[in-house]
Amino acid sequence: MSANFKMNHKRDQQKSTNVVYQAHHVSRNKRGQVVGTRGGFRGCTVWLTGLSGAGKTTISFALEEYLVSHAIPCYSLDGDNVRHGLNKNLGFSAGDREENIRRIAEVARLFADAGLVCITSFISPFAKDRENARKIHESAGLPFFEIFVDAPLNICESRDVKGLYKRARAGEIKGFTGIDSDYEKPETPECVLKTNLSSVSDCVQQVVELLQEQNIVPHTTIKGIHELFVPENKVDQIRAEAETLPSLPITKLDLQWVQILSEGWATPLKGFMREKEYLQTLHFDTLLDGVVPRDGVINMSIPIVLPVSADDKARLEGCSKFALMYEGRRVALLQDPEFYEHRKEERCSRVWGTATAKHPHIKMVMESGDWLVGGDLQVLERIRWDDGLDQYRLTPLELKQKCKDMNADAVFAFQLRNPVHNGHALLMQDTRRRLLERGYKHPVLLLHPLGGWTKDDDVPLEWRMKQHAAVLEERVLDPKSTIVAIFPSPMLYAGPTEVQWHCRCRMIAGANFYIVGRDPAGMPHPETKKDLYEPTHGGKVLSMAPGLTSVEIIPFRVAAYNKIKKAMDFYDPARHEEFDFISGTRMRKLAREGEDPPDGFMAPKAWKVLTDYYRSLEKTN
């Protein structure tokens, strides 16, 4: 035992004679109600133990990332990190090692008592020290889970990027666990992770399932994305049944919502909203039905509903299920239908903040059926549009897999419904740079243009996709670290209300960073021509929105054309005279007239796509 430790320990003993433990005034239950966005006390310690190189730190940080992404407050205490601060006065003698683990156990207990899931990753080689850590928690009435991260010594040595095992075998490091100091394997751990046989994600899932069994992690966290497709082995049977059922004709807009629901973008919805879900969305911007308070808040800011006429309601009201038919083809079954009044003005006023029928989406609502029908969906097959772009329509599960295949450790999403200019690219490049500076190794950009219904004067999807391809071809964005995919949602032009929907869908698809621009999902008021929504409110609302805590919001820095640099640049008010703000209206006017924008505004090939589009309009007209 070191002399410093003995001196400090003796001094601590002398001070402790007149110290009285003070009880908290706030109970754990009350603390649990306000810690994180998922109410309920879930304080505990997950104690990872194993040889150096077994994978403790990797699993610890991956588990922390998983829990935080599901809005469960947690913190990871790493052995090396703690020895840089709290325990920097301790060495590696037997006494110092014992004190190292004791201190960590006490700190972990405080974290757990505060309502966090505390994850510790320490070799902690001796059984008596780990047992003492358990007793510290159990005496305080706090759960303690010992997780043995088990990997053979030769595997640990092969992973030794620091060269510690090599130095220990050379005699340069004395008392190194596994070489000349014993590691006492846990006899009855709560979980054993075989890291030489299982992937990191599999190991994390094992721990999550343990926490689920102990009611630390809610069941809803594990269920993941809800796709609504009929299982392959039952498609023929359900399709045959669909042919015998009454049918409801649906519009292209309705089919786009069927696609959204079936692919899991609206998880946990099981179909078009029934009245209870509709009212929750309309009045609270959240889904509460069937979710107990400890399972937290599910953000849902827009109603996903199926309008029907009074005649169709009268015809189908007594059915337990019926088929949805698009252009003569039965695409899905709707089960246990519930019909309720479509109060259009109220819906529009709450979603859009206005009910003017001159708004393009509100116009469609006002012209739709006077009734809504909700019910569970069984979708017979994946929705395909056969427009040459289906390969870009990746589902949330496919996007998650693609990010995994690219070894992404951060995914930042950019939602757009317009062509990409170099100002957009500057923001995406800057976001990537900042993520690399923060220590991420493989940040991936999800360039995710909206592919559902848009208003008539927006550039059509096929031309936008050509333009995005040209941007990548000219390497304005890095093709190797970019996923271009189509987000199948229709556009509502509902400003801050809609931008929450856009963000939560990307969150479901695995994004953990979301770039929000000026006036997202906004448009000019159809009557006054002023901004329908205050341009900065979208970003502000996203930063406060309930249920979106697993996504970090990246505000859109204002970019404009720098006349001196002849390039897009972040706007500096102190140099206002250097900048030219090229509006979308001006950009479209230049493209329509076949003129070139200033050098550096947009990649030349991408600009040519835009001018080709407007020329095609002239020919059509």
Curated annotation (Swiss-Prot):
Name its GO BP terms in alphabetical order. Answer: 3'-phosphoadenosine 5'-phosphosulfate biosynthetic process; blood coagulation; bone development; sulfate assimilation
* Known pathway: Sulfur metabolism; sulfate assimilation
Extract the InterPro entries matched here: APS_kinase, ATP-Sase_PUA-like_dom, P-loop_NTPase, PUA-like_sf, Rossmann-like_a/b/a_fold, Sulfurylase_cat_dom, Sulphate_adenylyltransferase
- Entry's Gene3D superfamilies? HUPs, P-loop containing nucleotide triphosphate hydrolases, Sulfate adenylyltransferase
Adenylyl-sulfate kinase, as annotated region: 1-216
Q: Provide the free-text tissue specificity comment from this protein's UniProt record.
A: Expressed in liver, cartilage, skin and brain.
Q: Name one GO molecular function term.
A: sulfate adenylyltransferase (ATP) activity
Give the CDD domains listed for this entry.
APSK, ATPS
Asked if the record carries the keyword Nucleotide-binding, the reply is yes
Family label: In the N-terminal section; belongs to the APS kinase family.
Q: What is this protein called?
A: Bifunctional 3'-phosphoadenosine 5'-phosphosulfate synthase 2
Give the originating organism.
Mus musculus (Mouse)
